[in-house]
């Protein structure tokens, strides 16, 4: 391919594609762990968001935005967790008209059972890294993520070849 397109940024393409492949593999492996608890990654992420929030609650729209999921999808996930008795809908503290999602006592117990299993899964996924390499990789990934989050349009400043509009 490089001989057909000498200006092709092979390393940049390889890096991005490898991250995509890694993301798929990581999600698949973690999904296997979550399936044992009849949970999807979205449901697990929602439970963690609620639990880690200082108010121990989150609005469905905020969860949708943070998890980059559609609102209808978040509603389905919340409905599933409500049906299991792990999440409840309530009125907002600041605005009684607003809906907030909170973990129930059963949801907190489930979280307490599943967290150690997930932690072991995470450790298994990165077991091949030395502590130094893991620290270095975390720093590089964090920098890359911050750069992407701060850019209005990361592709807008891409150089164009003359005559190829």
Enumerate the predicted regions with their spans.
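C-terminal regulatory/oligomerization modules of transcriptional regulators
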Residues: 1-7, 132-165
């Amino acid at each position: 391919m490089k001989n057909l397109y000498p200006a092709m940024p092979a390393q940049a393409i390889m890096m991005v594609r490898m991250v995509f492949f890694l993301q798929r593999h990581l999600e698949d492996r973690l999904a296997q762990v979550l399936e044992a608890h009849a949970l999807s990654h979205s449901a697990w992420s929602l439970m963690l968001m609620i639990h880690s929030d200082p108010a121990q609650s989150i609005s469905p729209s905020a969860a949708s935005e943070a998890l980059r999921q559609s609102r209808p999808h978040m509603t389905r996930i919340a409905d599933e967790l409500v049906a299991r008795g792990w999440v409840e809908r309530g009125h907002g503290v600041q605005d009684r008209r607003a809906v907030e999602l909170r973990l129930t006592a059963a949801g907190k117990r489930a979280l307490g059972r599943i967290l150690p299993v997930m932690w072991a899964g995470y450790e298994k996924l990165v077991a091949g890294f030395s502590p130094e390499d893991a620290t270095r990789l975390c720093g590089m990934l964090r920098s890359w993520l911050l750069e992407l989050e701060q850019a209005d349009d990361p592709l807008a400043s891409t150089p164009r070849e003359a005559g190829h509009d």
